[in-house]
Structure formats: C-alpha cells, structure tokens
Amino acid sequence: MTETAYIYDAIRTPRGKGKKDGSLYQASPIWLTRILLKEMQQRHNLDTSLVDDVVLGCVTPVGEQGSDIARIAAIDAGWAQSVAGLTLSRFCASGLESINLAAAKVMSGMEDMVVAGGVESMSRVPMGSDGGAWYMDPRVNEATHFVPQGIGADTIATLKGFSRSDVDAFATESHRRAAQAWESGYYDKSVVPVTDINGMMLLDKDETIRPNTNVETLAGLKPSFIMPGKMGFDSVILDRYTTIETVNHVHHAGNSSGIVDGAAICLVGSAAAGQKAGLKPRAKITMASVIGSEPAIMLTGPTPACQKALDKAGMQASDIDLWEINEAFAAVPMNTADDFDISLDIVNVNGGAISMGHPLGATGAMLMTTVLDELERRDLQTAMITLCVGGGMGIATIIERV
C-alpha cells in the first residue's frame, strides 16, 4: 500500500552574499547544515533515531562540500548514529530532488522519516570547481550543444518577445516583494539565524536584497552575454532556432540570480512516523516529476516538468494557488507563467533568486520553505515548485496543505 509523504517542517538559513566579504563566508557548508539539523531537532524535541536518512542536494560536492556532507553533518550535529546520509546532484534541482527522493522513499514504505534539503557555500566552493566534461571537454561541448545559461535565457526572451524593460521590471518587482516580505515578517517562521562557533551573529536575513532597485537604475547595466555570444555561442543557438535572426541579449547581473551561500532542510515522513514523533503534518507531497528538455536553450524545462506533474496528479494549472518558479534569470519564470497563462501575481509572491540569490543545491528546498509558509499565511491549499536545470532539464513538485 502506498504511503502518503507528509512535510512536517521546513527551515532554511538566510542567504549570504557568495563572496569573501559575504556574511556567511566564515560559515562552512557543514556548519550551515549542522545549524539547521540542530534547529530541527530542538524545535520538535525530535528523537533523531526515528529518522532513517538525511538526503542533501549539493551541486559542487568537492572540497568542503565533499565526503558525503549529509552523513557527516548528521554526525556533527549529534544525531543518532543510525541516521544515514546521502549527497546528490541534479544541478540546480538538487535541493528539490532531495525532497522528491525522500517522498518516494516514504511513499514506497522503504523508509519512514527522512530529512531532505540542500546546501551550497558558493563563497568557499566556487561554482564549476568540480570540473566536468559538459563544459570543459570541447568534443562534449559540441555533442551536447553547450551554451552558457545566460544565452539560453536571452534566447527565451528573444523567442517570447520579452524586452529589456520587461525583464528589468520583473527583477525590480522581485526586490520589492522580497523587501516587503522581510519587513512584514513573512520569513520569520522558517529562517534560522546563523551564528559562529562562539555564538556571535553572522547573518539573520537575506543579504542581497536591494529595496531601491528600479527599472531606471537597471537600465544602466550592460548585458552580460554579448561577448560569449560573439565567441560562437550565439551561432549554436541560431543553428537550432531558425525562426530568429539574432539573439537579443537582455540579461545582466541585475536581472539574473545572485551567487550566495545557504542551506535548507525539510522533514518528510509517513503518517505513522509523524505520530510516533509527536508531529503534526503541514502539507503532503502530491506529485513530483523530472524531465529532459532542449539542451542548448537549457532553461525551458519547468513547463514540461510542471505539465507532467499536473497530468500525473489529474490536475490543471488553474488548480495551483501559488507558484514558485526559480528566478535563475528573469525570462525563466516569465516564460513558464506565459506558457500556463497564469498571472505573475501568484508567482514568487515573496521575491526570488534575483533579489535573494540562488545557492544552487539549496534553492529547491528554500522554495519549499517559502511557499509552505505563504500557503499557511494566506490560507490557501496548493503550490507548485519548479526549477530549470543545467543540461536541459526541469523539475516540479506539487504540494497540498493538510
């Protein structure tokens, strides 16, 4: 008999600027994870021996993020030695994939309770430092039609007719919503402040929000991907997308996701496991999906992934109350919203990665914490969480409050 996978809680760290002068540079990735594991245990007086596994997404699992950080963090946090650990990478989908895997484990009856989430310290373990043939081997570059993601985003904007002012307006709204959400206390429930080993505060709120951002200031920024386009990457796109004559380069640092540090975890379990632990479920995971998409444009995967999840759940886009569509670049959520004909009023209502940053392996789990809190605050029922994924993939998860 298939079990229902419930979400009992979801918490995250604030996002710190992913540079050496960022507030979380002093905090190692295992420290960020340790803080959340300890917080989860203390919040619920959780008997950690009831947890079967810790599954963490991490896009760059080398250096300080290597050696199966999930298992080592569980030991470091003082959890029961019976708690196993798994680190996985599905590029930017890793944090949400961890939650989906945890749900599958619970639904199958293989495990009863799992902590799932992700971590990425981009200031200490730089993006791409794990290498990989996809972008380092010229033969594989050609075979996989490798193009920098920003050019993929610019291609989406070109195909959809999103202008520079359109994507800048979206970015401006991301900052406005994030600033308003923090000012209104919407993040207070799920964000766990990060202190150092001596208990000194390092960061208690997302560090990269710029409340005064506007279309006029963003207009002064130069597009980031004109030069790589001239190096031959635009030609790769134009060979595959013959309906356009040129790529309109509209994305820049101000309307793209920021490089940040952070971690997030969710507690997922069966009804019986929750009852045994004295926990009350907040939501259930209704359906999840992953799918491959065209690899050159790379960032259109959310649409087919969401459609796949909706079809399997017997639902329609109109059944979803709130959407979290990762803001890798402004054109990505704009494209998905356009494909499903949904209002941006219900998309990323408290800001997103353009304003608060994209800590790669942690982002999917962070989106889960955000939308779960907001469903409860608005007394709504259903949410879709989705991300575009490197290599041309999409991931989607549908949750429902209980």
Regions found by a protein language model. Name each.
Residues 15-42, 60-63, 86-100, 112, ...:
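Active-site pocket-shaping loop/turn-to-helix segments
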Residues 24-114, 119-135, 191-205, 296-297, ...:
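Conserved beta-ketoacyl condensing-enzyme motif
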Residues 13, 17-20, 103-160, 227-230:
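Glycine-rich loop/linker segments at domain edges
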Residues 11-14, 25-31, 35, 43-45, ...:
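N-terminal extracellular/periplasmic Venus flytrap/periplasmic-binding protein-like
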Residues 58-112, 144-151, 219-258, 339-366, ...:
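Conserved catalytic cysteine-centered active-site region
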Residues 88-119, 157-187, 265-272, 337-338, ...:
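Active-site-proximal alpha-helical scaffold in enzymes
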Residues 1-18:
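N-terminal amphipathic/basic leader segments beginning at the initiator methionine
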